[in-house]
Amino acid sequence: MAKNSMKAREAKRTKLVAQFAEKRTALKAIISDVNTSEDDRWDAVLKLQALPRDSSPVRQRNRCNITGRPHGFLRKFGMSRIKVREAAMRGEIPGLKKASW
């Protein structure tokens, strides 16, 4: 079980990413545009660097909704492999059953 502070930190990162997404994409478009002058490009780079570090999407980590576990995360279910297995064994996930061959 992850600490509550880790879960809260991830929630904060998710909120920051959503808050600064438009500004970040606009600045990146200016930086990657070949017709932009060097001064404008440099200003955009400085503004991008001034944004909060946690507003970058690559700093986010997928975590289990139940336990907060960062490893073994299954995107389709939003849970770790352990909790998916437990829920499947209890029949809580429709259409999911244990494989047998």
From Swiss-Prot:
GO terms for biological process: translation. SUPFAM superfamilies: Glucocorticoid receptor-like (DNA-binding domain). One of its GO terms (cellular component) is small ribosomal subunit. It holds the Pfam family Ribosomal_S14. One of its GO terms (molecular function) is structural constituent of ribosome. Gene3D superfamilies: 1.10.287.1480. Keywords: Ribonucleoprotein, Ribosomal protein, RNA-binding, rRNA-binding. PROSITE patterns: RIBOSOMAL_S14. InterPro entries: Ribosomal_uS14 (IPR001209), Ribosomal_uS14_bac/plastid (IPR023036), Ribosomal_uS14_CS (IPR018271). Part of the 30S ribosomal subunit. Contacts proteins S3 and S10. Belongs to the universal ribosomal protein uS14 family. PANTHER family: 30S RIBOSOMAL PROTEIN S14, SMALL RIBOSOMAL SUBUNIT PROTEIN US14M. Binds 16S rRNA, required for the assembly of 30S particles and may also be responsible for determining the conformation of the 16S rRNA at the A site. This is Small ribosomal subunit protein uS14. It comes from Pseudoalteromonas translucida (strain TAC 125).
